[in-house]
Curated annotation (Swiss-Prot):
GO terms for molecular function: rRNA binding; structural constituent of ribosome. Belongs to the universal ribosomal protein uS11 family. Gene3D superfamilies: Ribosomal protein S11 (3.30.420.80). This is Small ribosomal subunit protein uS11.
Length: 130
């Protein structure tokens, strides 16, 4: 049998000036997705994707590293102005926002917290006793 040739999909360089940085900061991980204004993903990264494992994924340093990785990928596509949507109660949320603001060549135009708040919905998890 002949071996099949594996071809990789070529990365198409888009030229997008404006975008949205979605930061999902959970208690266990921080996920960052950079999209265009229509919501199509341009670049993404997470603390676990960068090699942080276990409890190290939830640290502020891991969140900062995830933001820098996603923004560097997005800047290859020409991102210059971004808005930030942040969701979740994680420990890396403030550090992630600061990391986006400190990137050279990127201007933050707006910031919005889109964390869903329950109006007496599901019962929350019980308090930890250590």
């Amino acid at each position: 049998m002949a071996k099949r040739k594996v071809t990789r999909k070529k990365i198409v360089r888009k030229n997008i000036a404006d975008g949205i940085v979605h930061i999902a900061a959970s208690f266990n991980n921080t996920m960052v997705t950079v999209t265009d204004n229509a919501g199509n993903a341009i670049a993404w990264s997470s603390a676990g994707n960068l090699g942080f494992k276990g409890s190290k994924k939830s640290t502020p340093f891991a969140a900062q590293a995830a933001v820098e990785d996603a923004m560097n990928k997005a800047m290859e596509h020409g991102i210059k102005n971004v808005g930030i949507k942040i969701q979740g109660p994680g420990s890396g949320r403030d550090t992630a926002v600061k990391a986006v603001g400190s990137m050279d060549g990127v201007r933050v135009t707006w910031l919005k917290d889109v964390t869903p708040l329950a109006h007496n919905g599901c019962r929350p998890p019980k308090r930890r006793r250590v």
